[in-house]
Regions:
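Conserved C-terminal guanine-recognition region of P-loop GTPase G domains, centered on the G4
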Residues: 68-72, 95-148
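Conserved G1/Walker A P-loop phosphate-binding module
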Residues: 2-89, 103
């Protein structure tokens, strides 16, 4: 699954201008509820080895990395702590909210846990309302397949 995601992301980032390549400076923000796979995606895209845990609160500060295998462009991925809404209750949620609202990411990738879509959609609607382009990425599809 990570290979397919990485390949898709690289294909999305390819731009062609009359046969010539455009240089890009792009900053992606990985947002979503706690424990939905943001850090796993960050590691797959950047080649990093950030700690991943199967419980909320593992990522407590934002982490930045460059997309691996792309030497021509400056493509930064920002792994944000998990949030349920843009109304923060914890310091980690403040970090995420402040980045999303004040640091002008070019695109927000909203990772949604496919096993519990309803819980994730409140944040999705708030992210769309920011006016920043949002890509909704359903994650954990393998768990849905196992359920039948």
């Amino acid at each position: 699954m990570n290979y397919q995601l990485e390949k898709t992301m690289h294909n999305v980032l390819k731009l062609n201008n009359g046969g010539g390549k455009l240089k890009m400076n792009i900053k992606f923000a990985l947002a979503g509820n706690p424990n939905c796979g943001k850090t796993t995606m960050f590691n797959a895209l950047t080649g990093a080895n950030q700690y991943v845990g199967n419980w909320p609160g593992v990522t407590v500060e934002k982490k930045e990395g460059k997309v691996k295998g792309n030497k021509e462009d400056n493509i930064t991925v920002v792994d944000l702590p998990g949030i349920y809404s843009l109304s923060p209750y914890t310091l980690e949620e403040v970090v995420s909210r402040d980045f999303l609202l004040n640091e002008d990411p070019d695109v927000i990738i909203d990772l949604v846990d496919a096993t519990n879509i309803e819980r994730n959609l409140y944040l999705t609607t708030q992210l769309i309302e920011t006016g920043v382009p949002v890509v909704v990425a359903l994650n954990m599809a393998d768990l849905i397949e196992k359920r039948g």
